[in-house]
Design a protein with these regions (language model features):
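Membrane-interfacial amphipathic/re-entrant helices at transmembrane-helix boundaries
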Residues: 1-24, 38, 52, 60-65
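Hydrophobic alpha-helical transmembrane segments
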Residues: 12-15, 44, 64-72, 94-97, ...
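Hydrophobic core segments of alpha-helical transmembrane domains in multi-pass membrane transport
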Residues: 18, 25, 50-54, 104-108, ...
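Alpha-helical transmembrane segments within multi-pass membrane transporters and channels
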Residues: 61-106, 249, 254
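Transmembrane helix-bundle core of multi-pass membrane transporters
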Residues: 103-163, 263-272, 299-308
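Helix-loop-helix "hairpin" substructures at the membrane interface of multi-pass membrane proteins
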Residues: 139-217, 240-245
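Cytosolic-side transmembrane-helix boundaries in multi-pass membrane proteins
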Residues: 175-189, 260-308
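Transmembrane alpha-helical segments in multi-pass inner-membrane proteins
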Residues: 213-277
């Protein structure tokens, strides 16, 4: 075992790529939860985005068209979820779980003929001047457009929620939908839009997995990424900046354990594979304990149905 074999610049660049699907899916879920809706169907939306994006990417020969298809597929599934919980007034938790099971099954059926096929590639984009900086350039400025989009989206969501009137309205609905309704805000319509955005982002995250991260279709390839995205929203305290940090920590642990396996570290492979998930559980436990002594960051109406 020789730790010097691990290239730090490549390690950081790899963790950014590994974290991107989580950033996208978790960012969408953060907006959904800020509106007062708990969507446990993120995993299902991600896997549908992954298979739809892969199929369209392979058939058209364009990974970018595949990414658009992934976003549309995730948004379409999220509209079904929105209709069930907002119009039919079904339980949010049960509906989200059912949607995840449905998504996993449908994706397995759709993707079966495409197993083992390689997807079209998304090329990396080197930012002029910045990419030439030694070490730092390789780590941060030689990535594909989806990575850059995820970073812009983090800032965009923060700005929307904290600086734009529409974002403040969405937050007010999440805190107390009855008061927001009494002030004339259209609770159902705004939640529909938030859920659709969340589904599209989850779909893009799934598409990134099958078109860039792997890149091929494998049944169940999300491997719990949707659940990790849900955990990251809680970890972040419903703040986009901390969400990005949490995703990069998880991605870093994931890539580090793969590198440790590659250099033959004397630790059981099963333990190394569990490390990212154990770290997530530990972080959630620590956050729960700390919040016993402070203010909870969750929206006041999170998970509660709105009845006119």
């Amino acid at each position: 075992m020789d730790l010097s074999e691990i290239n730090f610049a490549i390690l950081v660049a790899s963790l950014i790529v590994a974290s991107t699907p989580l950033v996208l899916a978790a960012l969408g879920e953060l907006v959904v939860e800020k509106s007062g809706v708990l969507n446990l169907g993120v995993e299902g939306m991600m896997i549908i985005g992954a298979v739809s994006g892969f199929i369209v990417g392979v058939e058209t020969g364009s990974a970018y068209i595949g990414m658009i298809a992934a976003a549309l597929a995730g948004a379409l599934l999220s509209l079904l979820f929105a209709f069930i919980i907002l119009v039919m007034q079904a339980n949010q938790v049960a509906s989200g779980l059912a949607l995840t099971i449905f998504g996993l099954g449908l994706a397995a059926l759709m993707g079966h003929p495409y197993t083992g096929i390689k997807s079209p590639q998304i090329q990396t984009v080197s930012l002029p001047v910045l990419s030439d900086i030694p070490v730092i350039g390789q780590m941060f400025f030689k990535h594909d457009l989806i990575v850059y989009f995820s970073l812009i989206a983090v800032f965009g969501v923060w700005y929307f929620l904290n600086r734009m009137r529409s974002g403040l309205v969405l937050r007010s609905i999440g805190e107390d939908h009855d008061v927001a309704h009494s002030l004339g805000y259209r609770v159902i319509s705004i939640r529909f839009l938030a859920i659709t955005f969340g589904g599209a982002m989850a779909g893009v995250g799934g598409g990134y997995l099958s078109l860039v991260r792997v890149p091929q279709w494998t049944e169940g390839m999300t491997a719990g990424a949707g659940w990790i995205a849900l955990a990251l929203v809680v970890f972040s305290g419903w703040r986009p900046g901390r969400l990005l940090l949490g995703a990069y920590i998880f991605g870093g642990i994931t890539i580090l354990q793969l590198n440790l396996q590659a250099i033959g570290v004397n630790i059981n492979i099963a333990i190394l594979s569990m490390a990212p998930y154990l770290a997530t559980i530990l972080a959630l436990v620590l956050i729960s304990v700390s919040r016993l002594h402070g203010k909870r960051g969750a929206p006041g109406c999170l998970g509660k149905s709105f009845v006119k």
